[in-house]
Amino acid sequence: MNAPQQSPEIGREILAAGYRTNLHDQGEGFPALLIHGSGPASPPGPTGAGSFRSSQTRRVIAPDMLGFGYSERPADGKYSQARWVEHAIGVLDALGIQQGDIVGNSFGGGLALALAIRHPERVRRLVLMGSVGVSFPITAGLETAWGYTPSLANMRRLLDLFAHDRTLVNDELAELRYQASIRPGFQESFAAMFPPPRQNGVDDLASNETDIRALPNETLVIHGREDRIIPLQASLTLAQWIPNAQLHVFGQCGHWTQIEHAERFARLVENFLAEADALHS
């Protein structure tokens, strides 16, 4: 009898900020911490925030954040920007990493930004992809993502919202993400993260304008022009406020820049991080 196949989203377990944390840790060199998005259609782990090839040139760490994927869910069921940032710092501490580059996707971008503001000594460079981090009126797409209730039809509709190129959305992907969304405990914790009114979730993940304007880090801001989850204006604002920011907008692209323009995305991020490697070598 064959042993049950382990999900590729399961890596190894560490204790971070007191919580059992699933993460993938691969490659060697200067570390990059990847922080995934929040939507049920956004896979954590190696296929989530920033599926780029930097593991060939650097150490890449991709944890499931508190309450997501195969990481522990807090007993009190309470989530906040501050708690997730504490968990991310706990990951760095558990791995003995004093400083790293932070790559944040969507929800994860808001956490990456807040982490850099609260713990500037822990961050070298920032990459913010389709990121929250400033306040904006919640979009219908984000309302749908955060209000998701498990069904295959709902997952298919959600995937269609994420991707500009609908050919990327097939039955296999919808089934895979749907199955992940019906794992025991998933829906209870997800509903607790972003309860209505969900505008509060956007505002909780936003950082203060004064703090953003004081951010010293070189920052790459990336967005899809046709993004229906996080408005392009959020990244335009971040690029205006962050002193050392550069902005790249992908045309013909929704909320999945790292998937819809995978090759260009990989080169863009790797070149940005490699520039810092060269400066500090």
Swiss-Prot record:
It comes from the Bacteria. Optimum pH is 7-7.5. The keyword Chaperone does not apply. It catalyses: (2Z,4E)-2-hydroxy-6-oxohexa-2,4-dienoate + H2O = 2-oxopent-4-enoate + formate + H(+). Its EC number is 3.7.1.9. The active site is at residues 106, 227, 255. GO terms for molecular function: 2-hydroxymuconate-semialdehyde hydrolase activity; carboxylic ester hydrolase activity. Keywords: Aromatic hydrocarbons catabolism, Hydrolase, Plasmid, Serine esterase. Pathway: Aromatic compound metabolism; benzoate degradation via hydroxylation. InterPro entries: AB_hydrolase_1, AB_hydrolase_fold, AB_hydrolase_sf. Residues 31-261 form the AB hydrolase-1 domain. Pfam families: Abhydrolase_1 (PF00561). Residues 30-55 are annotated as: Disordered. The keyword Zinc-finger does not apply. GO terms for biological process: benzoate catabolic process via hydroxylation. One of its GO terms (cellular component) is membrane. Belongs to the DmpD/TodF/XylF esterase family. Catalyzes the conversion of 2-hydroxymuconate semialdehyde to 2-hydroxypent-2,4-dienoate. This is 2-hydroxymuconate semialdehyde hydrolase. It comes from Pseudomonas putida.
